[in-house]
Curated annotation (Swiss-Prot):
Species of the source: Mus musculus
UniProt protein name: Protein sprouty homolog 2
Subunit and interaction comment: Forms heterodimers with SPRY1. Forms a tripartite complex containing GAB1, METTL13 and SPRY2. Within the complex interacts with METTL13. Interacts with RAF1. Interacts (via C-terminus) with TESK1 (via C-terminus); the interaction disrupts SPRY2 interaction with GRB2, potentially via disruption of SPRY2 serine dephosphorylation. Interacts with PPP2R1A/PP2A-A and PPP2CA/PP2A-C; the interaction with PPP2CA/PP2A-C is inhibited by interaction with TESK1, possibly by vesicular sequestration of SPRY2.
Required for interaction with TESK1, as annotated region: 178-315
UniProt record similarity statement: Belongs to the sprouty family.
Length: 315
């Protein structure tokens, strides 16, 4: 057993030596090949690579439709640098003749832009000068000249023969007066003034004196009965049931007498109607400004004397 163990332990170094000898005789180890291929860069070389920047762009100018766009060499530089970075190669530099040819269209475009700006300034100055010519000297001299602007249209000279006599319309509506009382006789002034009908709830509720009497004395019931019983459309007895001049006077009065037995407030209608007429006359006398005379002569008011106008030229 001990002999076998010794023989087994001794076989391992033999295998290792045989394996090492096989490596030396055959191909080399790939680890050694990797270490040989990797080159260690110094700090100066790294700084030099980072400092050299070949990607530059010039000022961009909008090309005109007549001109061809200038070639951009910077894009070529960029693509070459991207492909050359893993191989640590620097892109080829352009020759001075190529740089000069690429800058030529750029200078042409800049000159055309500058000439266009000059033409635009010329047109703006010419337009402003034309506007000042149209506005005149009053607007060109600033706010001080605005005081001399004419704000009133000058009137033409008046001649003595152009003055016409005043017509009836020029005299006014209140020019015709009564000869007896001296008050105006126009329709507006002589119209009778009725009692106010919207004197309740700050002139918002319509309540006339006639309606108060009709509802207070139950005459509204009589008017409704006459309205439904009348066959003639032209018969307005329902509006004036106590009228003596309209048709069916006896029939209406007899019907109201029978209804007064059941509605005794109907006996107060005639006295209330008389009081209403009296109040109406008093109110009209106080508030009517015109004439109340029945038969009077009308006199036209004299036009007040006006001093003669001065027809001389204004200074």
């Amino acid at each position: 057993m001990e002999a076998r163990a010794q023989s087994g332990n001794g076989s391992q170094p033999l295998l290792q030596t045989a394996h090492d000898s096989g490596r030396q005789r055959g191909e080399p180890d790939p680890r050694d090949a990797l270490t040989q291929q990797v080159h260690v860069l110094s700090l100066d070389q790294i700084r030099a690579i980072r400092n050299t920047n070949e990607y530059t762009e010039g000022p961009t100018v909008v090309p005109r439709p007549g001109l061809k766009p200038a070639p951009r060499p910077s894009t070529q530089h960029k693509h070459e640098r991207l492909h050359g970075l893993p191989e640590h190669r620097q892109p080829p530099r352009l020759q001075p003749s190529q740089v000069h040819s690429s800058r030529a269209p750029l200078s042409r475009s800049i000159s055309t832009v500058s000439s266009g700006s000059r033409s635009s300034t010329r047109t703006s100055t010419s337009s402003s000068s034309s506007e000042q010519r149209l506005l005149g000297p009053s607007f060109s001299h600033g706010p001080a000249a605005a005081d001399g602007i004419i704000r009133v249209q000058p009137k033409s000279e008046l001649k003595p023969g152009d003055v016409k006599p005043l017509s009836k319309d020029d005299l006014g509506l209140h020019a015709y007066r009564c000869e007896d009382c001296g008050k105006c006789k126009c329709k507006e002034c002589t119209y009778p003034r009725p009692l106010p009908s919207d004197w309740i709830c700050d002139k918002q509720c319509l309540c006339s004196a006639q309606n108060v009497i009709d509802y207070g004395t139950c005459v509204c019931c009589v008017k409704g009965l006459f309205y439904h019983c009348s066959n003639d459309d032209e018969d307005n007895c329902a509006d004036n049931p106590c009228s003596c001049s309209q048709s069916h006077c006896c029939t209406r009065w007899s019907a109201m007498g029978v209804m007064s037995l059941f509605l005794p407030c109907l006996w107060c209608y005639l006295p209330a109607k008389g009081c209403l007429k009296l109040c109406q006359g008093c109110y009209d006398r106080v508030n009517r400004p015109g004439c109340r005379c029945k038969n009077s002569n009308t006199v036209c008011c004299k036009v007040p004397t006006v001093p003669p106008r001065n027809f001389e030229k204004p200074t």
